[in-house]
From Swiss-Prot:
GO terms for biological process: lipid metabolic process; monocarboxylic acid metabolic process. It comes from the Bacteria. GO terms for molecular function: 3-hydroxybutyrate dehydrogenase activity. Keywords: NAD, Oxidoreductase. The keyword Zinc does not apply. Its EC number is 1.1.1.30. The gene is hbdH1. It catalyses: (R)-3-hydroxybutanoate + NAD(+) = acetoacetate + NADH + H(+). It is an enzyme of class 1 (oxidoreductase). Belongs to the short-chain dehydrogenases/reductases (SDR) family. The active site is at 153 (proton acceptor). Substrate binds at residue 140. InterPro entries: 3-OHbutyrate_DH (IPR011294), NAD(P)-bd_dom_sf (IPR036291), Sc_DH/Rdtase_CS (IPR020904), SDR (IPR050259), SDR_fam (IPR002347). This is D-beta-hydroxybutyrate dehydrogenase.
């Protein structure tokens, strides 16, 4: 379905980004990996998911505009540009507003929000020239609702939601679409560690700890998975989604419906 297309997925060496990259690869897209995790392992997983595709890597620090610009030049020179751009890179810090370190605020806004502006502004000219492109911003349920202690993350994710809508309006009469995915709790290695710590602290089975953690926010009592988010990204990249523009699609087990 995506043969001949190239997808650049930021923050794709693990978790959600890796799941999305593998799903796009399985549909024939070449993949450019980015992130601070094990790049070789991620590239191997992605290559296995998509037989015969090309997989590249650029280790741009998404808080630095100059490195993002270098990554986008790499995408253009080595792959002919990014046809599908998935802005997924993100970090988190939890603290009350009055205790929130200003440098952590700046880093979260830079990586979770400003990086998407830089990748988008640099990808759009090529997409418009081809009259085809897909921009998928990985926001969060925290782009729609808030939780205490997460001021920077919530601000950044609300910003991504607004930025997605503006991008969709500015590309509405082109073959380029822009949409956002808002995951709830996702079962990633980082979250699994939180589950295991809770189980140990409370002396309960891991499965019980997992369910209790999820039920605090998600009525379904089940985690979203990177594979499920990957399937949604594939749909948003498809021709069937050519008129899906500016959608803010939550996949959250009912979190935001409450």
């Amino acid at each position: 379905m995506l043969n001949g297309k190239t997808a650049l997925v930021t923050g794709s060496t693990s978790g959600i980004g890796l799941g999305i990259a593998k799903a796009l690869a399985a549909q024939g897209a070449n993949i450019i990996v980015n992130g601070f995790g094990d790049a070789d392992a991620a590239k191997a997983e992605i290559a296995q998911a998509g037989q015969g595709i090309r997989v590249g890597y650029h280790g741009a620090d998404m808080s630095k505009a100059a490195e993002i610009e270098d990554m986008m030049r790499y995408a253009q020179s080595d792959f002919g540009g990014a046809d599908i751009l998935v802005n997924n890179a993100g970090i988190q810090h939890v603290a009350a507003i009055e205790d929130f370190p200003p440098e952590r605020w700046d880093a979260i806004i830079a990586i979770n929000l400003t990086s998407a502006f830089h990748t988008t502004r640099l990808a759009l000219p090529g997409m418009k020239q081809k009259d085809w492109g897909r921009i998928i911003n990985v926001a969060s349920t925290h782009g729609l609702v808030a939780s205490a202690q997460k001021s920077a993350y919530v601000a950044a994710k609300h910003g991504i939601v607004g930025f997605t809508k503006v991008t969709a309006l500015e590309t509405a009469q082109t073959g380029v679409t822009a949409n956002a995915i808002c995951p709830g709790w996702v079962l990633t290695p980082l979250v699994q560690k939180q589950v295991e710590a809770r189980a140990q602290k409370e002396g309960i089975p891991v499965e019980q700890a997992k369910r209790e953690l999820v039920l605090e926010k998600q009525p379904s009592g089940q985690f979203v998975t990177p594979d499920e988010l990957g399937a949604l990204a594939v749909f948003l990249s498809s021709e069937a989604a050519r008129q899906v523009r500016g959608a803010i699609w939550n996949m959250d087990g009912g979190w935001v419906a409450q």
